[in-house]
Amino acid sequence: MSYQLDNGEVVRHEGKFFAMIVCWLLGNGCLFSWNSMLTIEDYYVYLFPKYHPTRVLTLVYQPFALGSIAILAYREAKINTRVRNLTGYTLFFLASLALIILDVATSGRGGIGVFVGVCIVSGAFGVADAHVQGGMVGDLSLMCPEFIQSFLAGLAASGALTSALRLITKAAFENSQDGLRKGAMMFFSISSFFELLCVLLYALIFPKLPIVKYYRSKAASEGSMTVAADLAAGGIQRSQDGAEEDPKLPERLTNKQLFLENIDYAIDVFLIYILTLSIFPGFLSEDTGSHSLGSWYALVLIAMYNVWDLIGRYIPLIERLKLTSRKCLTVVTLSRFLLIPAFYFTAKYGDQGWMIMLTSILGLSNGYLTVCILTAAPKGYKGPEQNALGNLLVMCLLAGIFSGVTLDWLWLIGKGW
C-alpha cells in the first residue's frame, strides 16, 4: 500500500511490525529512568531514612510533570514534535547520568544536601516525562492504534524490567559489602545507556520508517504543523505556510471542544491514576507490615504490580476482550475504588498472599483500562485533533498521578510522622 503526497511523491505503507517494536522501546525509555529510581527505593530508604524518599521523590516529580504538560498541551499545535521528544529523551539521559555523578561525588553518603540533589533530578525526570509521554502519545494518536498500544505496553514493560533487574541485583549483591549501592549504580548505568539508545532510535530510525512517513504525511495533508520536522528527517519536505493558509483545509476543533466531547475519557483516565498512585508505590513500600519475605516483600509487591500492568496492556489486542463502551469503561473505572478498603483491611489483617493478589488486580486493571481508553479516544478525528486529544488525555493522566501521590500521604495519618 502507498500514499501519494500533493507533490506526487509516493510514500510506502509498510514496516508496521518493526515500527511497533520501536514504539515499544520508546515507551520503555519514557519511564525507564523514573522506574529505576522507584525500584531502588530500598537504597534511598537506607540513605535517607527520615525523609520518606519513596513518597517525597514522587511528590517532587509530579508538579514538574503536570506543569510542563499543561503548557505543552496548550501550545501543542505549534510545537515541533521532533524537538520536543528529542529534548525529553536527552533530558532523561542527562538526569540519569547526573545520579551516577552525584553518588560518586559523595561516595554514597546520605544527608539533606544529597537528598535535595536527588530531588532536583526527580524534577528533571518529571519535565522529561511531560515532553516525551505527551509528545509521543499525541504523535502516535494520529497513527494506527497498534502503535499507541505498543508504546503504552513499553511504559509498563519498563516497570516490569526494572523490577526484574532489581530482584536480580538484590540477590547478586545481598551478601557483598556496599551491595545496595552497587545495585543502584548498575541500575543507573543501564538506564543512561538505554535513554541514549532511545535518543538515537527516535532521531535516526523512527522518522524514516515507511509506515510512519505515511501517517505523518496524511496528518500534514489534514493541516498538522507539528510533524514537519519529522517528515523532513524522513526525507519528505512540506511547506508549513501552505498548510497554515490553505482555505480548503477544514477547521479543526479547539482544545476546549475536544475536551468537552471526550470529558468522560478524561475523567476516567484521571480516576484510574489517582487510585493507582494513592496505593503504588508509597503504600506498597512502607505500609504493608512485616511478613516472612522480609526486605524482599516490598520489591515483590512492586514487581507483581508492574508485571500485571504489562499483561493488562496486551489484553485489548484480543478484540473480544477489548472494552469499547464508554459507559462500561466509566463503571469499571469507578469500581476500582473498592480496592482502597480492600488494601486497608488486608494490610491490617490479611497475609502476604492476599496482598499480592490485590496488587496484581491493581496493576492488571490499570494497564487494561489505560490502553482501552487511549486507543479508542482518537478514532474519528483528523490528525491535528488526534494529536491535541492525545496531549489532553496525558495531561489528565498526569493530573491523576499528581493527585494520587498527594493522597498517598493520607496513609501516614496516625503513624506519628
Give the positions of each predicted feature.
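Extracytoplasmic
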Residues: C30-D42, F280-D287
